[in-house]
């Protein structure tokens, strides 16, 4: 018992009085969904594992039509990739148009409409942008800079490049928008598979599977607008073995796709020999707690921990969710399920 209590006392954490700093949202599709059916048990395990291993200051809520052993928001959202459809978080929330060219029109329209209904139902306040942008294609340094890939130009080809950048600056309230090249052949072309800010000027950057020329090119593009930028190369252990979707490359072994909250960085765990080494490496470069979350089989569908989640800090949550967020962990799961 002493071994458990002493570290908590030293860090000043009182479990009974712990206030959460934000909510991590996930989504669980219906069991009948043919595309996700082979991964249903993996998705439940992912949520259970995340719930059991998350930071004391984080809460987990999953959009689901079934009760689970973790907190749920009763809502039908028949997909798992929340990051791309959800509002982008800067100093406020910004909801971009969700119209990915890698999905059929009826599919993305349904997902966008459903998620908008959920946002409205729960009284989220956000700015609407006229631009098309997946949430996974925007990285913010928590101050004045965002990074997106050049995919945004293709998705908004009725705008000039200058107009797009000006609109992003206005919507996001930033002074610097850095456009980086997308990886060749990457259907998604998301920045969250390439870079990750860990402070105002320092970022993790993928090793791009040993493609040094491309990595140097990305770094040069960033430093042209951000001369003070520093880079920490995150190793990968990519394997296409078991890739599920012929059109979308597996993300297994791509550790750069991390989720950051106020007090923690959640690192993908793939069941690969390099998992532990990468976790130690990440922990060496952040003062936040690095927590590894298993996404092994799920990642073969083309995404990892950041793609699967949407984190909203407490100050941007609607009031009724703040009430949930400040409840103790022993608050009734059934009560929470009924709230939303």
Specify the residue positions occupied by each region the protein language model found.
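Histidine/cysteine-enriched polar flanking segments
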Residues: 1-340
């Amino acid at each position: 018992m002493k071994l458990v209590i002493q570290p908590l006392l030293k860090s000043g954490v009182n479990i009974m009085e712990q206030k959460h700093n934000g909510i991590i949202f996930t989504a669980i599709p219906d069991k009948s969904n043919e595309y996700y059916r082979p991964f249903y048990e993996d998705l439940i395990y992912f949520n259970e594992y995340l719930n059991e291993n998350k930071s004391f200051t984080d809460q987990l809520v999953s959009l689901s039509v079934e009760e689970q052993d973790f907190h749920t928001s009763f809502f039908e959202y028949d997909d798992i990739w929340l990051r791309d459809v959800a509002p982008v978080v800067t100093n406020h929330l910004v909801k971009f148009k969700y119209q990915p060219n890698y999905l059929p029109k009826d599919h993305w329209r349904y997902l966008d409409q459903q998620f908008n209904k959920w946002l409205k139902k729960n009284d989220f306040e956000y700015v609407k942008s006229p631009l098309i942008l997946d949430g996974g294609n925007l990285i913010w340094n928590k101050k004045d800079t965002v990074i997106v890939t050049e995919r945004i130009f293709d998705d908004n080809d009725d705008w000039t490049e200058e107009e797009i950048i000006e609109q992003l600056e206005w919507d996001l309230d930033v002074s610097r928008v850095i456009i980086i090249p997308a990886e060749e052949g990457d259907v998604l072309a998301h920045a969250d598979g390439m870079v990750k800010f860990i402070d105002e000027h320092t970022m993790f950057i993928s090793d791009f599977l040993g493609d040094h020329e491309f990595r140097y090119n990305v770094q040069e593009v960033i430093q042209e607008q951000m001369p003070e930028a520093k880079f920490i190369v995150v190793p990968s252990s990519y394997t296409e073995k078991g890739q599920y979707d012929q059109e979308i490359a597996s993300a297994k072994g791509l550790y750069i796709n991390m989720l950051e909250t106020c007090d923690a960085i959640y690192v993908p765990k793939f069941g690969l020999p390099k998992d532990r080494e990468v976790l130690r490496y990440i922990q060496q470069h952040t003062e936040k707690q690095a927590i590894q979350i298993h996404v092994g089989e799920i990642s073969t569908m083309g995404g990892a921990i950041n793609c699967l989640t949407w984190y909203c800090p407490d100050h941007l949550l609607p009031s009724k969710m703040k009430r949930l967020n400040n409840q103790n962990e022993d608050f009734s799961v059934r009560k929470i399920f009924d709230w939303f």
